[in-house]
């Protein structure tokens, strides 16, 4: 057997820096898109590795966007073609000792899970992951003089938390970093010995994976799944160890809430998915622009992909897109990120003689067990031989003792007994000692046999985990199949070189045409300049459209980030509301002061060692639930107290007891409030005018005095004309000057009082006469 046939894989030991290989795959039109008659906007040219995207709304052929990749596959491409042309060389490099990574990227519902896993029970539709299993074990079975150790793990990133899909009830995992790269401690790994074992592990993990329904996909993946394969290989001749690691990643698709119709829990999942994918896009952009800072720590996904993007790994990015105009914006975004990822350079290094190789530990443990078992088996055989000898000697002693006893009996008959010692008792004691030694040796042998059986079982278990190559070659695959695989690899390499050459020719086409063309006349030169001008103008329009698209995408990203920020703010307010209403103030202050942010795990933690001692004196915090009021049995918020006071049906759940509270019913009122009488507007105006102060008051008094004088004179004249005799007339006449004198001396008030005294009351009755002593008699009148 040649050296080449004994080596695992066919790749070279030293490789220069290489870029991430980007492949685009377009799915066929779905039944829903056909029923809605949505036009196709994607044209794929597999021979050139070109994807052309056209906006149907614009309709201008010059506005078509063209993207070039390492390979492009349309809807007619099969799973077998994709695997043999793209994935097969990468898996061969992993079997050589390199790190490899394959991840599917794109919008939800574009066929990422179909590309990675395929359809169960259908060999033609089998995805990349199960085909990888077959290639690995085919290589192990036909490689001689090598020992292999294959371990697999399966995890998912759900809501920015790492979960072990092989142990669904385990605690959340953490991401750590060391000199060799990023790893996940406490991740459960299963040792596999065949293709069937690896398929069973994948099926168990898929059952535990989170899947949901959306308007875009009935079986939408709600988490990022990572299937890890670690292959350790040891050359039995040179005793060199190589380790190859392969990460197969099925990313969740980016979503827009308006299209997926996500709500409640699905909306939270979509926000976390979009956040992780946007972080991945930022990492790709930073690596493409050779930025000094790459934001790997923005999400758990980018941290796990740190070695695959810009690290020690060979990486393939499969961008899945949809052909419909309905997904134009998402398709354009995916193609742009994929185009940027082409310029990312990795530094793959072969992992030779690693310090953490389990294969080396297993070999050392096997040698130690063999050294323990070897001497014990030799001692066991020696003890068995001695035990057999003792069993053989025992009957001889019995015959000898019988002969001796016979001779002693004869001697006792012939001679008197001189000694009282009994030889038979001494022989029986020696026999008992021999039997005890034999029983003891048998117990030791049985105990050593049990220990040897345990060591042998452990040795068989360790040797069973190590798979030796070069067996069952004729039973699994024939020589023709091996040659066919080699030819397929050569064809894939040749096709890849043809695509690269075709792309280089297209880039140099413009320069070669300018060199070859010779201007014969001015008209041809003008025509040539016009064509150049039209091309430059088309490039200008394309760049301008690209700039506008970038602005719109940036605005869309800002709006999505604002929505995510609003959701986070609402969640924060809800948490703060709970803390303010249900957590005691001293506990809240203590938690705020002791909270620290762990950048490694990206979460807040509390230092239990630095927490203050509680006032109880026993050094322990009370486990009793805090109360908001001493008279209440449980913490109650202000809103619950207000609702408990009302008797509405919705407030029954806030009541601690099944008692309806009613208010006191008061009797009806028998009195009314006093209301002031209404005053007419005209009277109100007169009163307001009368209440005014100023020079008008004097005029009013003068006019009133004049009116009283005129009325008084009329009354006096009437009384004078209606007199009954001379006495009366004289009396009346004599009273006139008296009245005038009174008027002149006492003024208007006295005259008014006399006038009022002569008036009749409103009832028509005369007023009662006053007694004479009421007023003093006049002492005479004085003429003017």
From Swiss-Prot:
Give the GO molecular function terms: ATP binding; ATP hydrolysis activity; cytoskeletal motor activity; microtubule binding; microtubule motor activity
Residues that bind ATP, according to the entry? 106-113
The biological processes this protein is annotated with in GO are: anterograde axonal transport; establishment or maintenance of microtubule cytoskeleton polarity; microtubule-based movement; sensory perception of smell
Q: What is its main location?
A: cytoplasm
Chain intervals for the UniProt region annotation (Disordered): 371-449, 605-652, 742-784
Q: Tell me the SUPFAM superfamilies matching this sequence.
A: P-loop containing nucleoside triphosphate hydrolases (SSF52540)
Name assigned to this protein: Kinesin-like protein Klp68D
Species assigned in the record: Drosophila melanogaster (Fruit fly)
Whichever gene encodes this chain, its name is Klp68D
């Amino acid at each position: 057997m040649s050296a080449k046939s004994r080596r695992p894989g066919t790749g070279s030991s030293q490789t220069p820096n290489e870029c991430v290989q980007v492949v685009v795959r377009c799915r066929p039109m779905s039944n829903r898109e056909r029923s809605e008659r949505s036009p196709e906007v994607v044209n794929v040219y597999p021979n050139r590795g070109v994807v052309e995207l056209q906006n149907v709304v614009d309709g201008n052929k010059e506005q078509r966007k063209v993207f070039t990749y390492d390979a492009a596959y349309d809807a007619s491409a099969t799973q077998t073609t994709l695997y043999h042309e793209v994935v097969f060389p990468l898996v061969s490099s992993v079997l050589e000792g390199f790190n490899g990574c394959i991840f599917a990227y794109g919008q939800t519902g574009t066929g990422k899970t179909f590309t990675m896993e395929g359809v169960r029970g259908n060999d033609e539709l089998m995805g990349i992951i199960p085909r990888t299993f077959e290639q690995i074990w085919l290589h192990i079975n036909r490689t001689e003089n090598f020992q292999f150790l294959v371990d697999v793990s399966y995890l998912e990133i759900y809501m920015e938390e790492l979960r072990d899909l092989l142990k669904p009830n385990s605690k959340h995992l953490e991401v750590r970093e060391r000199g060799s790269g990023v790893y996940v401690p406490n991740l459960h790994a299963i040792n596999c010995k065949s293709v069937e074992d690896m398929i069973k592990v994948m099926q168990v993990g898929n059952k535990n994976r989170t899947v949901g329904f959306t308007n875009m996909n009935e079986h939408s993946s709600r988490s990022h799944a990572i299937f890890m394969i670690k292959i350790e290989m040891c050359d039995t001749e040179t005793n060199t160890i190589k380790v190859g690691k392969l990460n197969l990643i099925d990313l969740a698709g980016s979503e827009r809430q308006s299209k997926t119709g996500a709500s409640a829990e699905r909306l939270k999942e979509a926000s976390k998915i979009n956040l992780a994918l946007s972080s991945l896009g930022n990492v790709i952009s930073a690596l493409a622009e050779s930025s000094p800072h790459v934001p790997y720590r923005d999400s758990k996904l980018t941290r796990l992909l740190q070695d695959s993007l810009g690290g020690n790994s060979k990486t393939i990015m499969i961008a899945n897109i949809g052909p419909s105009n309905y997904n134009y914006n998402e398709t354009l975004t995916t193609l742009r990120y994929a185009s940027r990822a082409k310029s990312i350079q990795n530094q793959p290094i072969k992992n030779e003689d690693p310090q953490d190789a389990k294969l080396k530990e297993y070999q050392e443990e096997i040698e130690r067990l063999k050294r323990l078992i070897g001497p014990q088996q030799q001692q066991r055989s020696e003890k068995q031989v001695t035990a057999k000898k003792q069993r053989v000697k025992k009957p001889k002693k019995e015959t000898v003792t019988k002969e001796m006893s016979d001779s002693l009996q004869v001697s006792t008959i012939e001679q008197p007994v001189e000694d009282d010692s009994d030889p038979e008792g001494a022989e029986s004691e020696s026999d008992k000692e021999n039997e005890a030694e034999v029983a003891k040796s048998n117990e030791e042998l049985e105990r050593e046999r049990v220990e040897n059986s345990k060591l042998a079982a452990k040795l068989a278990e360790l040797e069973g985990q190590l798979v030796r190559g070069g067996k069952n070659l004729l039973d699994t695959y024939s020589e023709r199949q091996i040659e066919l695989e080699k030819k397929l690899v050569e064809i894939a390499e040749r096709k890849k070189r043809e695509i690269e050459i075709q792309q280089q020719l297209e880039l140099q086409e413009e320069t070669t045409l300018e060199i070859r063309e010779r201007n014969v006349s001015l008209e041809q030169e003008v025509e040539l300049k016009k064509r150049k001008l039209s091309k430059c103008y088309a490039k200008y329009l394309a760049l301008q459209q690209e700039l506008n698209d970038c602005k719109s995408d940036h605005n869309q990203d800002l709006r999505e980030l604002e929505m995510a920020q609003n959701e986070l703010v609402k969640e924060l307010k809800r948490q703060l509301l709970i803390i303010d209403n249900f957590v005691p103030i001293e506990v809240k202050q203590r938690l705020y002061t002791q909270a620290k942010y762990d950048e490694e795990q990206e979460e807040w933690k509390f230092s239990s060692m630095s927490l203050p001692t509680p006032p109880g004196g026993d050094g322990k915090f009370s486990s009793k639930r805090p109360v908001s009021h001493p008279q209440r049995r449980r913490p109650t918020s202000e809103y619950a107290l207000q609702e408990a006071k009302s008797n509405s049906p919705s407030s029954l759940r806030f009541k601690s007891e099944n008692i309806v509270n009613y208010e006191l019913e008061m009797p009806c009122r028998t009195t009314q409030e006093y209301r002031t009488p209404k005053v007419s507007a005209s009277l109100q105006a007169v009163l307001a005018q009368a209440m005014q102060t100023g020079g008008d008051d004097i005029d009013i008094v003068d006019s009133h005095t004049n009116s009283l004088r005129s009325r008084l004179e009329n009354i006096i004249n009437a009384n004078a004309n209606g007199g009954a005799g001379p006495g009366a007339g004289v009396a009346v006449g004599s009273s006139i000057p008296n009245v005038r004198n009174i008027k002149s001396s006492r003024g208007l008030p006295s005259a008014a009082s006399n006038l009022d005294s002569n008036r009749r009351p409103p009832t028509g009755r005369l007023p009662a006469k006053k007694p004479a002593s009421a007023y003093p008699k006049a002492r005479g009148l004085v003429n003017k």
